[in-house]
């Protein structure tokens, strides 16, 4: 059951890799468990969030992981303690050949109202600067050291640029939104355009934050 969410004793919460991160955050709130407030508003599933160490510059999901279960091709299940995993900026040391099946988070008891207020405050900040009303895959490039990928792309005049049904968000240029009928190829086309523009103008090679499947490097 890849989408199951189970609240255990001692502040533990276990979620299958297919569970939406938004559901996990809400279940933590219902159980009056604090620690995942920084994940509110982040799209995607637990598997993707753990594999990419989703979060912000100051807080990331790996800080709350107790252990992760993966499937090793040809070997079977393997459990990693959080301390065995190297957590980096939008990456982990979990081999890409392994499939994340579930993760257990260590949370703390809190007051439901305080947790909800913190989540709402964070959601307001995201809504004020990110395209929360349209489908997207989150930010598409990693921020270079001491720079903002969104500001770099915006400085190249690409806010609002389109390819098919995909558009570089007019709210935050490091997001590509689906205006209705965007294909993956449309998104990748815009990513390439933004990458090349930033490289040509600033001599900065933006690294992809999203993982591309079925496309060349």
Language model segments and positions:
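Structural signature of FAD isoalloxazine-binding scaffolds in flavoprotein oxidoreductases
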Residues: 1-4, 50-81, 95-102
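Phosphate/pyrophosphate- and phosphate-bearing ligand-binding catalytic cores of soluble enzymes
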Residues: 71-192, 196-217
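A generic local secondary-structure boundary/capping motif
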Residues: 25-28, 36-40, 50-60, 68, ...
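Short glycine/serine/threonine-biased micro-segments
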Residues: 16, 39-46, 53, 136, ...
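Gly/Ser/Thr-rich beta-alpha loop segments that engage phosphate groups in nucleotides
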Residues: 20, 43-50, 57, 140, ...
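Residues embedded in well-ordered beta-strands within globular domains across many folds
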Residues: 6, 37, 69, 210-211
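Anion-binding (especially nucleotide phosphate/pyrophosphate-binding) glycine-rich loop
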Residues: 1-46
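Short beta-strand or tight-loop elements
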Residues: 34, 64, 83-85
């Amino acid at each position: 059951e890849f989408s199951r969410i189970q609240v255990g004793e001692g502040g533990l919460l276990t979620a299958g890799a297919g569970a939406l991160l938004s559901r996990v955050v809400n279940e933590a709130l219902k159980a009056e468990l604090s620690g995942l407030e920084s994940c509110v508003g982040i799209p995607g599933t637990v598997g993707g969030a753990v594999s990419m160490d989703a979060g912000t510059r100051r807080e990331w999901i790996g800080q709350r992981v107790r252990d992760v279960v993966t499937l090793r091709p040809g070997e079977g299940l393997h459990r990693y303690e959080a301390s065995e995993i190297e957590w980096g900026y939008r990456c982990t040391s979990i081999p890409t050949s392994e499939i994340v099946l579930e993760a257990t988070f260590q949370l703390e008891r809190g007051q439901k109202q305080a947790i909800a207020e913190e989540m709402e405050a964070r959601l307001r900040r995201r809504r004020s600067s990110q395209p929360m009303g349209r489908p997207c895959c989150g930010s598409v490039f990693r921020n270079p050291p001491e720079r903002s990928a969104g500001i770099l792309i915006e400085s190249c005049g690409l806010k609002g640029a389109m390819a098919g049904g995909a558009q570089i968000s007019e709210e935050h240029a490091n997001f590509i939104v689906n205006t209705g009928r965007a294909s993956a190829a449309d998104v990748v086309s815009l990513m390439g355009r933004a990458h090349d523009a930033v490289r040509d103008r600033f001599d900065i090679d933006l690294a992809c934050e999203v993982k591309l499947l079925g496309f060349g490097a």
